[in-house]
Amino acid sequence: MVMSPFAGGEPVITKSIHHDNFISEFETNLDCTDIIDYYKFISENGLTIKRHSEKGAADSQVFMHELPVEYFHDNLSRSIFRRWNYVTDQALREYVLKYDILVGRRFQHTMAKIQKTEPGQGYHAWHYESTPSAPYRKLATMIYLNDGFEGGETEFLYQHFRVTPKAGKFVIFPCDWAWTHRGNPPLNNDKYI
């Protein structure tokens, strides 16, 4: 008998929504509580970065690949990434089958960050993920780690479309300029992605 590496069983996709605009949403049963707790631990140890906009503080975040090794290679972070990658793999397989021109392409998950946005703050500038410094990016992925707040949608400019946050919701979309987007601010509680 093969034992599951996940306490409580593997995280699974419980609902998939493929929109006509190449944005896909995947609801999962991923418990994100310990990911938020891990972020808080990293923050308490002074390892988060505050991002600022012209209006002041925007959000705080941690780039997982930039953490000192003693904060990254422990049992908790391994468990978090095992589950994160498991959900990513399921969603990406489904996305690729939906858009079969992608079948046979190689995808690499090169960077992960956890981000906290406080009420009224956030990075509201329209942007897209494929930039001159990262032209290799083809698909962006995001997991909403919590809900329980008003606002906080991810808004896509040219699609006139918003994704509503829900804990465990995984989103995939193309990185090119046509999917210019922004994170709208949460209005009354912290938002974690």
Regions of interest found by a model, annotated:
Residues M1-F170, A178-I193:
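Fe(II)/2-oxoglutarate oxygenase catalytic core
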